[in-house]
């Protein structure tokens, strides 16, 4: 009969550990993890107060700068740049081309040169492109800026997710990613309020959307300059930790995060992880929820505008759904970390958005404005959570740092590619209801829900199989981080 294994099994679990010099942590290979909760709490507190806020602020501007075309469109962007037909949708598609293709290369560079260097560099690049957009006078100039912006923004989300996996344990990751990613929901609310204020400016020759680009681009560049100085490259070089905390922080990661910390960059090893069959299924799931996330991020103002509001009120009425989305995001990710469970939480979040799109498809906007606006709340409530739980999920099941760098870059690229599908689906000829686009998005979301639940069931089945082989019942957090081929490894389902 299977027996339960206590969570603290550090003295029973053999773990292959290597430091920078390649020496094992001890003769027996047993990791000595400090049990003093005060030290662990101090480490988490310092990371939560000194690392997370800056990363969240950086991603706030990442999301604002990426999605500000939605606000600019409501202020006459297309008219000022003499855009016709589907040129707005094409602009969004071209952004996603560079945004998706360069995720893996950017994350490989981050692994090689560290997040301390690469994350601020990427931010400086896209901030410059945002600022330059205020000087464009035609569609061609806008495309050039958006292509370059996509190139610089590529790898930032993946880079931060990977970067966080080198500081936080597996059961701490989803909540921290949600706090960081919650900036995207705040960005939606903040950009709506900012656009509301900026569009009140009446200048004889400069339209309001250009002032928006100037303000957002300048703020991005200033924050990137500060990040160069503030960000640490690893737990061992973190200036906020005492020597004892540095040692414990490293042991925390070895026990429940990575096979090896500060692992030397190895391109062949990193890319080899992409050949696993599970990566293809993860990628399809990423694309599925990515379509919905991009649709909400890029077109929520247009969906709200269906209610008949003018430019100012449309941007103002997008604030509340984003705020609700932020609260739901934090609640679901806290629950996901607490229960060490990903698939059911992920499917539940996707279901909210699925129902929201179904309502928008079936409701008569003019006759039922209240339910239509409620559907927008459902969209925001479920559009942002999937990214946090999904990227926590595949990182939890990839113990190698090199592997996580490659897989995270690939998965972020896959999920971002949903933006291409979304941008093509929201053709201007189907405005203002965009029914075909809503149907496409709901279909992808429905397929994704089925795949997530099936994948989670497979992980649970394989964990039970491993329990039977070993004759013990082991939970994911009961054992130190080992190779997935090790008999004691357990998947996060």
From Swiss-Prot:
Membrane topology recorded in Swiss-Prot or TrEMBL: Multi-pass membrane protein
One Gene Ontology MF term: transmembrane transporter activity
PROSITE patterns: MFS
Keyword list, A-Z: Membrane, Transmembrane, Transmembrane helix, Transport
Gene Ontology cellular-component terms listed: membrane
Sequence intervals crossing the membrane: 90-110, 117-137, 147-167, 179-199, 211-231, 279-299, 316-336, 343-363, 370-390, 406-426, 435-455
Annotated compartments: Membrane
Keyword Transmembrane helix assigned: yes
Pfam families linked to this entry: MFS_1 (PF07690)
Family per similarity comment: Belongs to the major facilitator superfamily.
Physiological role: MFS-type transporter; part of the gene cluster that mediates the biosynthesis of enfumafungin, a glycosylated fernene-type triterpenoid with potent antifungal activity, mediated by its interaction with beta-1,3-glucan synthase and the fungal cell wall. Might facilitate the transport of glucose units to the subcellular site of enfumafungin biosynthesis.
Name under which the protein is recorded: MFS-type transporter efuF
Source species of the chain: Hormonema carpetanum
